[in-house]
Amino acid sequence: MDIKILKDKNNSLLNRRELDFVVKYEGSTPSRSDVRNKLAAMLNAPLELLIIQRIKTEYGMQESKGYAKVYADEARMKQVEQEYILKRNPAPGAEAEEEEA
C-alpha cells in the first residue's frame, strides 16, 4: 500500500493540518485503521490526533482518495469534530476496550 499526499494545508483557525491523499494498493481495499496507521507513521503524527474524514474508492480501481485531519491537541479535536467521526477513528486504547466489551 502506497500513500501519496496531494495537498497539505495548515488551518491555523481550527489548529489542524488538512490533507488530501491517494492510497494505491493491490488486492482488497485496505481498512480505515491500516490507512490511518500508515498515514500517522508517514506524518510523524500521534495516532490519537489523526482523523480520517473520508475514503472513497472508484469502482474497479486499485486506488482510493481520502481526506484526513491532524489536530495539534485532543481538546480542540473533540470540540470541532462530530461524534460519529470520532467513533470511526478511535484512539488506540479505545479499540482494545471495545473488543473486550
Swiss-Prot record:
Keywords carried by this UniProt record = Ribonucleoprotein, Ribosomal protein
MF terms from GO for this chain are: structural constituent of ribosome
- The cysteines covalently paired via disulfide bonds are none
Share an example GO biological-process annotation for this protein. translation
In terms of SUPFAM superfamilies, this protein maps to:
Ribosomal proteins S24e, L23 and L15e
Cellular component GO terms, alphabetically?
ribonucleoprotein complex; ribosome
> What HAMAP family does its record include?
Ribosomal_eS24
- Report the sequence similarity comment from the record: Belongs to the eukaryotic ribosomal protein eS24 family.
Protein name from the UniProt record: Small ribosomal subunit protein eS24
Record organism? Methanosarcina acetivorans (strain ATCC 35395 / DSM 2834 / JCM 12185 / C2A)
Gene this protein is translated from: rps24e
